[in-house]
Amino acid sequence: MSTIISYFGFLLASIIFTLILFISLSKIQLI
């Protein structure tokens, strides 16, 4: 059970990190 939770947390963190990178790149292109 804890393995599934830790895997879900890692997946969520990677998605958030990717979104932050994408947003920052978009802002750089807009400028």
UniProtKB/Swiss-Prot annotation:
The chain crosses the membrane at residues 3-23. The keyword Thylakoid applies. Keywords: Chloroplast, Electron transport, Membrane, Photosynthesis, Plastid, Thylakoid, Transmembrane, Transmembrane helix, Transport. GO terms for cellular component: chloroplast thylakoid membrane; cytochrome b6f complex. InterPro entries: Cyt_b6/f_cplx_su6. It is a single-pass membrane protein. GO terms for biological process: photosynthesis. It is found in: Plastid, Chloroplast thylakoid membrane. It holds the Pfam family PetL. One of its GO terms (molecular function) is electron transporter, transferring electrons within cytochrome b6/f complex of photosystem II activity. The 4 large subunits of the cytochrome b6-f complex are cytochrome b6, subunit IV (17 kDa polypeptide, PetD), cytochrome f and the Rieske protein, while the 4 small subunits are PetG, PetL, PetM and PetN. The complex functions as a dimer. Belongs to the PetL family. Component of the cytochrome b6-f complex, which mediates electron transfer between photosystem II (PSII) and photosystem I (PSI), cyclic electron flow around PSI, and state transitions. PetL is important for photoautotrophic growth as well as for electron transfer efficiency and stability of the cytochrome b6-f complex. This is Cytochrome b6-f complex subunit 6. It comes from Abies homolepis. The gene is petL.
